[in-house]
Swiss-Prot record:
Main location: cytoplasm
Entry annotated with the keyword Phosphoprotein: no
Subcellular location: Cytoplasm
Pfam families: CLP_protease
Gene: clpP3
Name of the molecule in the record: Probable ATP-dependent Clp protease proteolytic subunit 3
EC numbers on record: 3.4.21.92
Amino acid sequence: MPIGVPSVPFRLPGSQYERWIDIYTRLSQERIIFLGQEVNDSIANRIVAFLLYLDSDDPSKPIYLYINSPGGSVTAGMAIYDTMQYIKAEVITICVGLAASMGAFLLASGAPGKRLALPHARIMIHQPMGGTGRRQATDIDIEAREILRIRQQLNEIMAQRTGQTVEKIAKDTDRDYFLSAAEAKEYGLIDKVIENSTMGNN
């Protein structure tokens, strides 16, 4: 049986009464966003909305983006990435579990010096995927060229974020490339491996 979204009690300031809200809404009130699924248009729209709201609420306070995601849509992920760069509030990224593909890209896109991972987290980078299906040859050619363009764009951003060369990023992402939290730090995907919440604030 699938587990539904858990609800938690919440008391409005100045009120003696509690009401139940879903845990993700409650976390957002603490400026915490949790990406815990495949990146698609629906989840991207939700995260973008949270980012925009929290930035407008107080751009001087950081936003915490926790990531445990296998990746997903490049266009949906880029919508989140662009919003992270657009807003004034810094976005601290924390990997719990797995940050793969677009999940790893978003992890590396956090505020400089504040891209974090828990000790047993795993990070995986690879090139963007594409499918041909049953389509005309000209359409397949168009998609292939677009995938190559996107791959180059992602490689350039990852090189800028990690300090690696574009050539090394291209070579390493040619196939699935897994890293431990410590290896991801050495690679430049994250800045620190943390064991408790206080370490992330230093």
